[in-house]
């Protein structure tokens, strides 16, 4: 019996439920529904705009404390001039670089996402992680791959 995309999505749904990763389970469930409903336009939309839409929602969520006044001007100045704040700036710059590397890797080899999902599930189960960064995971994988190239 050939392995179909429906079977893979069902397996990811099951693994997501068993691993208590509601995000992975929900994503697999939604994609399985779209696939079974033959709503191919949704796949096109998600491929073209899904990442931007997801990042927009993430940024909106992160920026809410700025918008609702929970972060003061004093907090902002402190975080731009303190060691933790400067390290956060450095971390943000490094993360965006790694994210771009991860995006390039996923565009060059879309099948790599399966490994990233499995790695995310392992991270949830064994490291208490949260699967919010497939781009970061891909970026770290790209960094590992570059390191591996140089050590050969």
Curated annotation (Swiss-Prot):
One of its GO terms (cellular component) is plasma membrane. Its main location: membrane. It is a multi-pass membrane protein. The chain crosses the membrane at residues 14-34, 51-71, 76-96, 112-132. InterPro entries: UPF0756_TM. The keyword Ubl conjugation does not apply. It holds the Pfam family DUF441. Keywords: Cell membrane, Membrane, Transmembrane, Transmembrane helix. Belongs to the UPF0756 family. PANTHER family: UPF0756 MEMBRANE PROTEIN YEAL. This is UPF0756 membrane protein Daud_1310. It comes from Desulforudis audaxviator (strain MP104C).
